[in-house]
Swiss-Prot record:
This is UPF0312 protein PputGB1_5030. SUPFAM superfamilies: YceI-like (SSF101874). It comes from Pseudomonas putida (strain GB-1). PANTHER family: PROTEIN YCEI (PTHR34406:SF1). Gene3D superfamilies: Lipid/polyisoprenoid-binding, YceI-like. Keywords: Periplasm, Signal. It holds the Pfam family YceI. Belongs to the UPF0312 family. Type 1 subfamily. Transmembrane segments: none annotated. GO terms for cellular component: periplasmic space. InterPro entries: Lipid/polyisoprenoid-bd_YceI, TTHA0802/YceI-like_sf, UPF0312/YceI.
Amino acid sequence: MLKKTFAALALGTALLSAGQAMAAEYKIDKEGQHAFVDWKISHLGYSFIHGTFKDFDGNFTWDSAKPEASKISVDLKTASLWSNHAERDKHIASADFLDVKKYPEAKFVSTAVKSTGEKTADVTGDLTMHGVTKPVTFKATFNGEGKDPWGGERAGFNATTTLNLNDFGIKGPGATSQTLDLDISVEGVKQK
């Protein structure tokens, strides 16, 4: 009886360890320009301003057999915002909006991943921006994974969400400019 119990325990431990070993750590490849944090906001209800954050870093764990076990963490430098208009960028960076001197970083850390389809998931986590932390859910799409031409392995995702700027203590330039659309595209390099 003891022998059977030990054998079952050993088998269970081996299976559990094998499942944990399948999750891989990836570093987001921003140096190769294979990752982007883009944003869009209404300009007074007449058009949209598009921009990006140029300086960010992050990593994620990914297991295609168990997507719910995945995690992601992204840190970005708020002063790296760019909208192709220097004066507007200065204004957005000012205390009127992002206040990048007081709040130089924004951070997202996932707390849950829920599969919603074969290649889609809701990624929920804590977003800290402008000194406020709120739960946010991104709609994520798995783009694929595999070997790259340089001998490494990669995985890629896109994720979108809409933020209410008032939730983070940020005043938009008008009633129609209170929501910000985020579109994140990441390609990660598997760490050895």
